[in-house]
């Protein structure tokens, strides 16, 4: 698992600017969605096109957050990347990666194939949301209908988990924030290839775009933000 602590001098600057470390000190759980980005075989399996070795370590935290989000009355959304052919994304697949890398990604992310499937240790449920995207961001309206679906369910807060921290998770989180969703990246619910890339993304995000919380902190927020009637019934 990546380290999740920020240097004290960085936290001091946050407090100087914001008056506190965390942007969102409370959430309304019924208006909250846990968004799980690209936890697919393509990014979790050994030798897959986008393998992130640490991604598999996220599974216990993601499953816990999914259970807690459902129990609190929120929405769980599973986002899967999909590609059909290189012509669907020419600037990236024809220019920014080698041809053999592009072919590997298209092969692994073809809907119906093994690479496109969710990692088998995850615990999705039938009533969860399942959406597909064809760009890095799940909150780019031309690439994914997730923003519209969440708005229709009166969601105003999103919790971002998945992989890669500094690519699809970050792109999704930034676009969510720019679309006026209160956005929290989960520090031990995202993974990438290096600690440096992971922490750099989280530092920028909490400083400018939204908030960063651990899974344990997020569980506490979800429980505290439950409707009183739901909490009393339990």
Where do the model's predicted regions map?
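Glycine-rich, phosphate-binding/catalytic loops in enzymes
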Residues: 50-54, 94-95, 177-178
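Acidic-leg catalytic submotif of subtilisin-like serine proteases
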Residues: 33-43
């Amino acid at each position: 698992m990546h380290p999740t602590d920020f240097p004290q001098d960085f936290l001091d600057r946050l407090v100087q600017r914001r008056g506190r470390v965390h942007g969102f000190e409370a959430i309304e759980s019924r208006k909250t969605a846990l968004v799980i980005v690209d936890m697919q075989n393509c990014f979790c399996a050994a030798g897959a096109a986008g393998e992130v070795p640490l991604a598999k370590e996220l599974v216990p935290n993601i499953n816990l957050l999914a259970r807690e989000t459902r129990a609190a009355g929120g929405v769980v959304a599973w986002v899967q990347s999909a590609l059909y052919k290189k012509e669907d994304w020419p600037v990236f697949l024809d220019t920014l990666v080698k041809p053999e890398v592009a072919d590997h990604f298209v092969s692994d992310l073809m809907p119906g194939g093994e690479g496109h499937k969710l990692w088998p240790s995850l615990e999705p449920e039938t009533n969860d949301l399942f959406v597909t995207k064809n760009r890095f961001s799940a909150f780019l309206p031309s690439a994914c209908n997730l923003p519209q679906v969440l708005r229709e369910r009166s969601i105003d807060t999103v919790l971002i988990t998945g992989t890669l921290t500094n690519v699809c998770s970050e792109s999704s989180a930034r676009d969510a924030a720019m679309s006026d969703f209160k956005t929290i990246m989960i520090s031990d619910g995202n993974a990438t290839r290096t600690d440096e890339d992971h922490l750099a993304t989280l530092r920028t995000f909490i400083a400018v775009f939204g908030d960063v919380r651990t899974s344990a902190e997020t569980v506490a927020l979800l429980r505290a933000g439950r409707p009183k009637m739901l909490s009393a019934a339990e």
